[in-house]
């Protein structure tokens, strides 16, 4: 199965950027630059306070809306957390879980990533599950072993049907926010190994339905080459998603591959 037959997705991650007042201009310019062909899903994962405004403003350009994290708890005395039910009420369709910054800065564990994945699925929100190796792990030839462990932990207890409603984002930690990017061959090698791991956890048919995104400093200059790889079905975009023109170029490259 190739890119055209799997869901192609470009998911921007605004991180701790943008304000509500900036959203109308962003979505208007994005709409003007988006390709006419609607062969891929385009999503912005925004900070919590921006989700509702982005959902409203994005309706005209068919822009999907996502969150950047979710509580592993459904309700209760958990000050400062946001539940999957609340995200659903805001209109969130996707949610990032296990981002390297959450794992590094907030000590998020594989068990928490698994719990968040399950609670999102229970609320009909698509989890974008982030996995990836550090520079030290790559240098010690541990990339595939470590990433396979992360995938297995995230999907623990999920049925094949549930797994098919998940998205994986491969983000090499050494390429996040550094301007460094894995070569297309390096990215494809790891994404292919992720699909092989899914095949072992479930079966080949299930593995072939799950979209795998590349999330390590993809930009307008390298998107074409990365998206041409057989096991890369889109991108989870950081800094480039803050600029409408750059983001639109990445979307256009994805749509072109998906429509062929």
Question: For the regions a protein language model found, what residue spans apply to each?
Answer:
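Active-site loop-to-helix "anion-binding N-cap" substructures in soluble metabolic enzymes
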Residues: 1-260
């Amino acid at each position: 199965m190739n890119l055209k037959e799997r869901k192609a997705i470009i998911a921007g991650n605004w991180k701790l950027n943008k304000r509500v007042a900036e959203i109308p201009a962003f979505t208007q310019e994005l709409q003007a630059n988006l390709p006419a062909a609607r062969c891929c899903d385009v999503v912005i994962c925004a900070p919590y306070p921006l989700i509702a405004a982005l959902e409203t403003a994005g309706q005209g350009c068919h822009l999907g809306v996502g969150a950047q994290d979710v509580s592993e708890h459904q309700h209760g005395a958990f000050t400062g957390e946001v539940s999957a039910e609340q995200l659903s009420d805001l209109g969130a369709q996707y949610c990032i879980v296990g981002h390297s910054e959450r794992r590094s800065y907030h000590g998020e564990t594989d068990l928490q990533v698994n719990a968040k994945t399950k609670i999102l699925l229970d609320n009909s929100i698509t989890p974008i599950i982030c996995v990836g190796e550090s520079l030290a792990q790559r240098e010690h030839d541990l990339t595939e072993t470590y990433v396979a462990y992360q995938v297995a932990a995230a999907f623990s207890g999920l049925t094949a049907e549930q797994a098919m409603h998940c998205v994986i984002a491969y983000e090499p930690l050494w390429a996040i926010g550094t301007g460094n990017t894995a070569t297309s061959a390096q990215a494809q090698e790891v994404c292919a190994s992720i699909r092989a791991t899914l095949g072992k956890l479930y079966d080949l048919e299930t593995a072939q339905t799950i979209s795998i995104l590349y999330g390590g400093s993809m930009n307008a200059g390298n998107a074409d080459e990365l998206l041409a790889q057989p096991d890369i079905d889109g991108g989870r975009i950081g800094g480039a998603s803050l600029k409408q023109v750059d983001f639109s170029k990445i979307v256009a490259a994805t749509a072109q591959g998906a429509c062929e």
